[in-house]
Swiss-Prot record:
The keyword Aminoacyl-tRNA synthetase applies. SUPFAM superfamilies: Anticodon-binding domain of a subclass of class I aminoacyl-tRNA synthetases, Arginyl-tRNA synthetase (ArgRS), N-terminal 'additional' domain, Nucleotidylyl transferase. One of its GO terms (molecular function) is ATP binding. This is Arginine--tRNA ligase. Belongs to the class-I aminoacyl-tRNA synthetase family. Transmembrane segments: none annotated. It comes from Rickettsia felis (strain ATCC VR-1525 / URRWXCal2) (Rickettsia azadi). Coiled coil: none annotated. Its EC number is 6.1.1.19. The gene is argS.
Length: 576
């Protein structure tokens, strides 16, 4: 029995019985109180009902208490504060969750969630102008793990990478590759400021020289540009795909911005929005305060972004008449919706925080308020090596690439460490600490817990083979897991699916990492108690019954840690 789900269903049933309203009960929370004296679980249902019925929350809470006290898994119910209902669960109900994990694993990990959403999540979308730098890794890991979580709870998810292959940076890439091509033909070249001086483009010039000889030099400029652009973008995308694959990240779709231009999708989207009365000709208001020298007060085509909460309307054309980047964003969002997505998630870097309102406006307009949109910002990673910050710049050619860091510490460490802070908070990534074998290193601490659980089972198999066979056959008495430490660990194990569900609901993958660190900490504490007091050891040859129960506990811990690591794309370690 999943205690969290069971209590939620019983609260819904009580709401229907008492107030003939089960829909409102679906919005109630079932949480774990921060303080044990407030019980095991707590709900705000009384305050929700009270607001709806215009009655006292405590009066509502008392009625719920009267109905729910009779439930077989409830030990006691207390009313606290303005009307919180605090539940203490019987120990045997918590203990039974161990059996559910071990014997009904698939059912225990199943989450009953709305599966009608077809989610498109766009993340990374780095310009294809060079190897990915470590700054992109946070958004890449966040987006990938969020997608995995959403898939885990049952949503249909498309993982997408938007290829910015139609902007000025691509023109700079082409110019740089052409210089490297001429260099490969024997010319002495200098890479001007503003282009890409990194040596990673030298092989591209050599390939072009080998394939074309000097033909590109005499070719029509437009034809030459097209050939070099297609070649360079594809090579850089191959590089980015490999960098991502080495991090365990694979997108379903790489979508070309250029294709929106080539297929006339921008024109089609503008025509649609014009018909909706959302495109007009006008001038943008001057920036507040001192007039910015780049402010353009010309009459131009604008999208009524302010209709949907944006701070200003947005230009869809540049001064030269070409489509703006925003116009591409309009067409791209429409394309996603036309493909069947009814929930768009954008994962952006800290430098794009100003895009949140405009993206929300785009989706609200094109989705006609029927398509959900969430824009998640990943703050900067402060990458440190031996206490010295590493500057990251493709243009300067001295960035720390994903490949560099992956080679140094491995994908599992990168993936886990990128989740050790909430995505909208800056993250310090210390190369020294992530390689330490100590409790100060969270990935080591969690992996070590997994290894220890396996060693417990191996030790029992070796020292107590008959008892181990009984354990595998499910012959254990879980009521023996009665110490405070054991019950607290069991409560935490029982909350695993609740944590997973919350991670999906709030788009917060870091909750998984935090949960695993907490579980590992509690397990290691109990392990250390066993060093001081043999009664706390997991394998006690003189007490077969208690050993059987603790083998079940160790196995449940192992399964939940493995499940958590699998969700975030980290390989559980069997030995260290």
């Amino acid at each position: 029995m999943n205690i969290f789900n069971q209590l939620k269903q019983d609260i819904i049933a009580a709401s229907k019985q008492l107030y003939n309203n089960q829909e409102i009960a679906n919005t109630a929370n079932i949480e774990t109180p921060k303080d044990n004296f407030n019980g095991d679980l707590s709900s705000n249902i009384a305050m929700i009902i009270a607001a709806k019925e215009s009655i006292s929350p405590r009066e509502v809470a008392l009625k719920f208490k009267e109905v729910l006290t009779t439930l077989p898994y409830i030990a006691s119910i207390e009313i606290a504060g303005p009307g919180f209902i605090n539940f203490t669960i019987k120990a045997e109900s918590w203990q039974a969750s161990i059996k559910d994990i071990l014997q009904h694993e698939e059912k225990f990990f199943e989450i009953d969630i709305d599966k009608s959403r077809n989610i498109n999540i766009e993340y990374v979308s780095a310009n294809p102008t060079g190897p990915m730098h470590i700054g992109h890794a946070r958004g890449a890991v966040y987006g990938d793990v969020l997608a995995r979580i959403l898939q885990k709870v049952g949503y249909s998810v498309t993982k997408e990478y938007y290829v910015n292959d139609a902007g000025s940076q691509i023109n700079d890439l082409v110019s740089t590759v052409l210089l490297r091509y001429r260099e490969a033909l024997g010319e002495k070249i200098t890479i001007p400021a503003g282009l890409y001086p990194g040596e990673y483009l030298i092989p591209l010039g050599q390939i072009l020289a080998k394939e074309y000889g000097n033909k590109l030099l005499t070719m029509n400029e437009n034809e030459r540009f097209k050939i070099v652009k297609n070649f360079a973008v594809e090579k850089m995308l191959d590089l980015n795909r490999k960098d991502l694959a080495d991090l365990g990240i694979k997108h379903d779709i790489f979508f070309s911005e250029q294709s929106l231009h080539d297929k006339g999708e921008i024109e089609g989207t503008v025509k649609l929005l014009t018909g909706m009365g959302l495109i007009y000709e006008g001038t943008l208001p001057a920036p507040k305060g001192k007039v910015h020298e780049e402010w353009d007060n010309r009459v131009q085509k604008l999208f009524k972004s302010t209709n949907y909460g944006d701070s200003q309307d947005r230009p869809i054309e540049k001064a030269d008449g070409s489509w703006s980047y925003f116009a591409s964003d309009l067409a791209y969002a429409k394309d996603k919706i036309d493909r069947g997505a009814n929930h768009l998630i954008y994962v952006l870097g800290a430098d794009h925080s100003g895009y949140v309102k405009r993206i929300e406006a785009i989706v609200k307009a094109l989705g006609k308020e029927q398509v959900k949109v969430d824009v998640k910002i990943c703050q900067l990673v402060n990458f440190v090596e031996n206490g010295v910050p590493v500057k990251m710049s493709k243009r300067l050619g001295n960035f720390a690439s994903v490949q560099d860091v992956n080679h140094e510490v491995g994908k599992d460490i990168i993936r886990f460490m990128m989740l050790t802070r909430q995505n909208d908070k800056p993250l310090d990534f210390d190369l020294v600490k992530v390689k330490e074998q100590s409790r100060e290193n969270p990935i080591f601490y969690v992996q070590y817990a997994h290894v220890r659980t396996i060693s417990i089972l191996s030790k029992a198999r070796e020292l107590m083979p008959e008892s181990y066979n009984n354990f595998e056959e499910g012959k254990y008495d879980l009521s023996l897991l009665s110490s405070e430490e054991e019950i607290e660990i069991i409560k935490l194990l029982a909350s695993w699916t609740k944590t997973l569900e919350a991670s999906a609901k709030y788009f917060e993958p870091h909750r998984i990492a935090f949960y695993l660190i907490n579980l590992a900490s509690r397990f290691h504490s109990m392990w250390n108690f066993g060093k001081e007091n043999s009664d706390y050891r997991f394998v006690i040859e003189s007490n077969k019954e208690l050993t059987l129960a603790r083998l079940a506990l160790a196995s449940a811990i192992q399964k939940v840690i493995a499940s958590g690591l699998e969700v975030i794309g980290v390989e559980p370690m069997d030995r260290m």
